[in-house]
């Protein structure tokens, strides 16, 4: 570790650049103690030099235990860190304060109290209060709070909705439901005998579902949402045919809904049938490809069915018979 040895003990350290003025700043990147003038000259050359971190130096104390001089900041707080290491600066207090604020903010996020914040800011219940609302379906305090909140919303927004949504087929009267009732569902049976070909059919499917009983389970009352009427679209022809077949015969419905699983077996059966028909018309006659070879083989002498060696007389006889055969049968073309 480099040491700063003052020329005169007890006097301020001189500048490492000009060696005349007392040093005012210490630069850790340059490892130099500079006066104000030299510091401005050195660190104004380029943007990289401007980013060097400098420590304002106070009075240089006596050498410490490590043999290096110690910086005493202007605030009067003595530092026990050597200057060459540059571990002490007057920004430490600011860093500590910032770290303390970050710790407090993290603690506030980790120890978040939803019930306290919701009661202070007027937000809907959260956490245990929400579970209490779900469990309190029979009435009581939760019902009173919901009734009061819905009354306030209805006074501010007008008669927009009472928290119930009706789902019905267009053309049918929708019954008016008031208060908190159970979920009701009316389903008209489908009559397959009244089915007519085409897109129109006489039977009707009606579904009326009241969602008013679910209002107890909602944390925020639905005040500004208008009445929602959902219309069921008319089914397509393929869908109608499918349900009609299902109502008429379960076997037909199963054959329609199930994918074709036996196509491979049908194809194999057709291939086997074609093979059998072809085998019936098959002929086992030998096809003579070379007529000259056949005629030559017929004239060769055989011993027990096998060809034997020929003598000179046999060759003459063969030639005689071959010329006779050629004159009678004609010339056999060769390819």
UniProtKB/Swiss-Prot annotation:
Residues 268-310 form the CCT domain. Pfam families: CCT, zf-B_box. It is found in: Nucleus. Keywords: DNA-binding, Flowering, Metal-binding, Nucleus, Transcription, Transcription regulation, Zinc, Zinc-finger. One of its GO terms (biological process) is regulation of flower development. Zn(2+) binds at residues 15, 18, 38, 43. Its main location: nucleus. Residues 141-179 are annotated as: Disordered. GO terms for cellular component: nucleus. Induction: Circadian-regulation under long day (LD) conditions. Expression increases after the beginning of the dark period, peaks at dawn, stays high four hours and gradually decreases until sunset. GO terms for molecular function: DNA binding; zinc ion binding. A zinc finger (B box-type) spans 15-57. InterPro entries: CCT_domain, CONSTANS-like, CONSTANS-like_Bbox1, Znf_B-box. Plants over-expressing CO3 display late flowering under short day (SD) conditions. Probable transcription factor involved in the regulation of flowering time under short day (SD) conditions. Functions as a repressor of flowering under SD conditions, independently of HD1, EHD1, MADS50 and MADS51. Controls flowering time under SD conditions by negatively regulating the expression of HD3A and FTL. Belongs to the CONSTANS family. This is Zinc finger protein CO3.
């Amino acid at each position: 570790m480099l040491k700063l040895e003052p020329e005169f003990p007890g006097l301020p350290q001189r500048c490492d650049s000009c060696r005349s003025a007392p040093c005012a700043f210490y630069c850790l990147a340059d490892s130099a103690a500079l006066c104000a003038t030299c510091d401005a000259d050195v660190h104004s050359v380029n943007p990289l030099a401007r980013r060097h971190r400098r420590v304002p130096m106070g009075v240089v104390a006596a050498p410490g235990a490590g043999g290096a001089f110690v910086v005493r900041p202007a605030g009067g707080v003595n530092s026990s860190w050597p200057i060459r290491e540059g571990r002490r600066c007057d920004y430490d207090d600011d860093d500590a304060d910032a770290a303390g604020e970050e710790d407090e903010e993290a603690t506030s996020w980790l120890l978040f109290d939803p019930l306290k914040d919701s009661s202070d800011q007027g937000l809907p219940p959260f956490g245990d209060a929400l579970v209490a609302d779900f469990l309190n379906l029979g009435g009581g305090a939760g019902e009173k709070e919901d009734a009061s909140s819905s009354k306030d919303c209805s006074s501010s927004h007008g008669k927009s909705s009472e928290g119930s949504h009706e789902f019905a087929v267009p053309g049918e009267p929708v019954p008016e439901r008031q208060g908190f009732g159970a979920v009701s569902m009316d389903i008209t049976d489908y009559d397959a005998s009244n089915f007519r070909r085409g897109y129109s059919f006489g039977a009707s499917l009606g579904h009326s579902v009241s969602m008013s009983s679910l209002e107890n389970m909602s944390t925020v009352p639905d005040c500004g949402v208008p009445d929602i009427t959902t219309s069921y679209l008319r089914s397509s022809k393929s869908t109608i045919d499918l349900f009609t077949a299902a109502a008429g015969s379960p076997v037909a419905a199963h054959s329609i809904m199930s994918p074709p699983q036996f196509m491979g077996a049908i194809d194999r059966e057709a291939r086997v049938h074609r093979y059998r028909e072809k085998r019936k018309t098959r002929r086992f006659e030998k096809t003579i490809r070379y007529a000259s070879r056949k005629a030559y083989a017929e004239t060769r002498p055989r011993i027990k069915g096998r060809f034997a060696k020929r003598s000179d007389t046999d060759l003459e006889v063969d030639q005689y018979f071959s010329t006779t055969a050629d004159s009678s049968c004609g010339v056999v073309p060769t390819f």
